[in-house]
């Protein structure tokens, strides 16, 4: 019985340790990546997994050690895994809609550093210019779609008027 308890404690400790390692990797990704989209990806994917592993390890440990099953831990696991990706998706969508900086391969410096920041390589004017260009593209696409819809509507009206003219000639 003592060996089983030690094995379960070892599994719980291993899960907590893996969760910690993944959290450190997530922190490095947040610091290393240049824009809000890459940072949100790094933080959401790995931190969700790290919290999952850590809380499952804690749940296993306390269930084994004190014969206490915590519904709060189980609910927190479910809640974090449901809300974290959704919340970060909303943050990324808001950043995109406001014209946030988007990293491009040609923006990459010749050598990368773990302390790389977008502020070092991009001025405010550049970011505003990219946001303006993106907004112009969106407007152009919107107006092109509107023109296409107007053409389709005009064609439908022409077809209807031709069919009415044919009906009148038959009568």
Curated annotation (Swiss-Prot):
Q: Do you know which PANTHER family this protein is assigned to?
A: ANTIPORTER SUBUNIT MNHG2-RELATED
Basic and acidic residues bias (residue ranges) = 144-156
Protein name as it appears in the record: Putative antiporter subunit mnhG2
Q: Which Pfam families match?
A: PhaG_MnhG_YufB
Report if keyword Ion transport is assigned: yes
Region of interest (Disordered), ranges = 144-171
Q: What is its main location?
A: membrane
Q: What is the membrane topology listed in the Swiss-Prot or TrEMBL record?
A: Multi-pass membrane protein
Keywords in alphabetical order, please: Antiport, Cell membrane, Ion transport, Membrane, Transmembrane, Transmembrane helix, Transport
Which family is annotated? Belongs to the CPA3 antiporters (TC 2.A.63) subunit G family.
Q: Which residues form a coiled coil?
A: none
Domain of life the protein comes from: Bacteria
Q: Where in the cell is it found?
A: Cell membrane
Q: Name one GO cellular component term.
A: plasma membrane
What is known about its subunit structure? May form a heterooligomeric complex that consists of seven subunits: mnhA2, mnhB2, mnhC2, mnhD2, mnhE2, mnhF2 and mnhG2.
Q: Where are the transmembrane segments?
A: 11-31, 51-71, 72-92
The molecular function terms of the Gene Ontology recorded here are: sodium:proton antiporter activity
State the species of origin. Staphylococcus haemolyticus (strain JCSC1435)
Annotated NCBIfam families: CPA3_mnhG_phaG (TIGR01300), PRK12586.1 (NF009236), PRK12674.1-2 (NF009314)
């Amino acid at each position: 019985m003592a060996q089983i308890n030690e094995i379960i404690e070892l599994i719980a400790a291993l899960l907590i340790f893996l969760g910690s390692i993944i959290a450190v990797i997530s922190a490095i990704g947040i610091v290393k990546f240049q824009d809000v989209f890459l940072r949100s990806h790094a933080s959401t994917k790995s931190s969700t997994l790290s919290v999952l592993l850590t809380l499952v390890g804690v749940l296993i440990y306390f269930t084994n050690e004190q014969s206490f099953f915590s519904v709060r831990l189980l609910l927190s696991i479910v809640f974090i895994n449901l809300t974290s990706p959704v919340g970060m998706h909303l943050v990324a969508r808001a950043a995109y809609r406001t014209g946030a900086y988007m990293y491009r391969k040609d923006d990459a410096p010749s050598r990368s550093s773990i302390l790389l920041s977008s502020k070092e390589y991009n001025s405010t004017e550049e970011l505003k210019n990219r946001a303006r260009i993106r907004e112009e593209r969106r407007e152009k696409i919107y107006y092109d779609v509107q023109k296409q819809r107007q053409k389709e509507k005009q064609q439908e009206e022409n077809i209807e008027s031709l069919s009415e003219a044919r009906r009148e000639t038959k009568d």
